[in-house]
Amino acid sequence: MPSHCFLIGSLPLEVIDSPRVWRDKLPANYRPFAVDTTAGPDRAVLTVADRTPWQIPEGEAPLSEVFNDLGVTHLYRHPGGWLVSISPRPGDSPRLMLIDPSFARAELRVAGSDPMGAFVLDSMLRIFFSQYAATRGALLLHASAVELDGNAYLFMGRSGTGKSTHTRLWVNTFPGASIINDDVPLVQSDARGIPTVFGTPWSGKGCVWRRVSAPLRGIARLRQHPADEFIAAEGIDAFIAVLPGISVMTADADLYSRACTTILAFLNCAAVTVGTLLCTPRHSAAILSRSSLAPSDSQ
């Protein structure tokens, strides 16, 4: 059966695509992360199977309901773990994935002939890998990540706030700046305990799929405003600024607790500056955010 192996940060991921949803052609966003094999049993494995989907008990209310670029996503408890449902378009029948309690194994049931199969597989991989990463002291964050002078900066905020606009201001304002990921970068501590930002296959409309990394230097939560202002955050305020950006099941108390502990570990690194950036879509906002997040580098 077709098996595809990837390395995202230092976390291995295997996809067993029995129905050939990918038609034996790896999507462009996964190619930079492809590896020959994933060594050892400690890896995330998602198996795609063309089998009868599980049944959602009639009348059972979902534990959560999310509307975003993936479609409509529901979460249910299941005797085998956690059942994730995605309806890519209004009126679509749900496609289902079962994640086991360890968050290291999952099965997606979708037909190889499903016209939305590749989209569903990509979406479910993102959901599954986010939970797996949280069990390994890493987090996928909803942010746009930019690198400059060997350091990474994350810009977070609600959809439509201007995260991508702001990182592109950096690219256009500061020579040498480049986008690491435009939607869902991975943050993971390296062997020295330094939080590091990695590219991932999931980058929204920006299509920035780069297998690169840089140490995390700063995080800013963006809010549109008529004037530019940076408000530094520490302690609980810094934690609250980052928390909404994680993609972890709150229904699993242990997993959510691990994710919160990981955020605190990242924020305890003295090199990481956090704050809220009230900003305009102008170059002045990029100049302010750089001078606030990395004052010694902006001289």
Task: Give the role of each language-model region.
Residues M1-S159, L169-S178, P185-Q299:
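A noncatalytic interaction/capping subdomain that flanks phosphate/NTP-handling catalytic cores
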Residues K163:
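Conserved lysine of the Walker
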